[in-house]
Amino acid sequence: MFYSCLKKILFQLDPEHSHEFTFRHLKRITGTPLQFLISQSVPTKSVDCMGLSFKNPLGLAAGLDKNGDCIDVLGAMGFGFIEVGTVTPLPQQGNQKPRLFRVTEAEALINRMGFNNLGVDYLINNIKRSRFGGVLGINIGKNKETPLEVSKEDYLICMDKVYPYAGYIAVNISSPNTEKLRQLQYGDLLEDMLTSVKKKQTQLHEQHDRYVPVAVKISPDLSEEELIKLADAFLKHEIDGVIATNTTLDHSLIQGLNHCQQSGGLSGRPLQPSSNETIRLLSKELKGRIPIIGVGGIDSLMAAREKIAAGASLLQLYSGLIFQGPALIKKIIHHI
């Protein structure tokens, strides 16, 4: 009831202003006793995945708390894990505004944010102050000005810095909003990226005497043949997990709706079919050897169960939280 009233107010604002307003106030209470105002009691439903123990299988997807400003207060909502970022080596403003749009009729969002963030060092300072007891994933990417051919260097810089603080590291090579980034999912660029990331992971494991799993986040807009090649590459390089999926450039399911012509990645309910199919095909190829984190359009208990049936071991929310509120977290965890 409270969130329904709050949503009516927030949805009167521009989506990005609404996000900034919400996070400005959440930041004030994160890590303070006032967190009880939005904290929720959820049952423990432990899941072992990627060598980690998760209190429950539901997490927050990357993109909502890019800079780690509100880790503790978001954790108090009941998430078993939180993924912050996408973060880049240097701060950057992202793409020109407006760049975030609500497709309210479809409970969907379109964004072309472009990895706007305050940089990896700012994120780490926030993580150091956090007392979140769940698993913390850190999603990393490249700066806009870094040429694609040397983009792996940005990922390696971020890995170096976040490794001591991460439960797992998510390598984002699938955002549609950084020019040519998705090319990193193919051919020699993919091979070079995976080789470099695994080599760096081995070095950091030895340096810190602690193994931090690496997951790769992929697009829902891949053909079956492309997915098979990706799966083969992940198996070859012994990647620890796959996050499926990022947002889609296919807007066909929202034709005729408000903002449907806006460019950018579509998330929310219309993403469910392609995300589920990607997970199903990927699961078939990986044969249980690499776990899948399912994300894309989870807005109900049924949608969560469909992701698990398709082959996901863990789940993540983003748009569903915006449209349904924290009650969705509690409902899914209680009944999953």
Swiss-Prot record:
InterPro entries (UniProt xref): Aldolase_TIM (IPR013785), DHO_dehydrogenase (IPR050074), Dihydroorotate_DH_1_2 (IPR012135), Dihydroorotate_DH_2 (IPR005719), Dihydroorotate_DH_cat (IPR005720), Dihydroorotate_DH_CS (IPR001295)
Q: How does it sit in the membrane?
A: Peripheral membrane protein
Give the binding site residues for substrate: K66, N111, R112, M113, G114, F115, N172, N177, N246, T247
Query: Can you state which reaction this protein catalyses?
Result: (S)-dihydroorotate + a quinone = orotate + a quinol
Q: Which GO terms describe its biological process?
A: 'de novo' pyrimidine nucleobase biosynthetic process; 'de novo' UMP biosynthetic process
The enzyme class is oxidoreductase
Q: Which SUPFAM superfamilies match?
A: FMN-linked oxidoreductases
State the needed cofactors, names only: FMN
Give the metabolic or biological pathway.
Pyrimidine metabolism; UMP biosynthesis via de novo pathway; orotate from (S)-dihydroorotate (quinone route): step 1/1
Alphabetical list of Gene3D superfamilies matching this protein: Aldolase class I
Cite the binding residues for FMN: A62, G63, L64, D65, K66, T86, N139, N172, K217, T245, G268, G297, Y318, S319
Cofactor binding, note field? Binds 1 FMN per subunit.
Q: Does the keyword Membrane apply?
A: yes
> What is the annotated quaternary arrangement, including any partners?
Monomer.
User: What is the protein's given name?
Assistant: Dihydroorotate dehydrogenase (quinone)
* Taxonomic source organism: Hamiltonella defensa subsp. Acyrthosiphon pisum (strain 5AT)
Gene expressing this chain:
pyrD
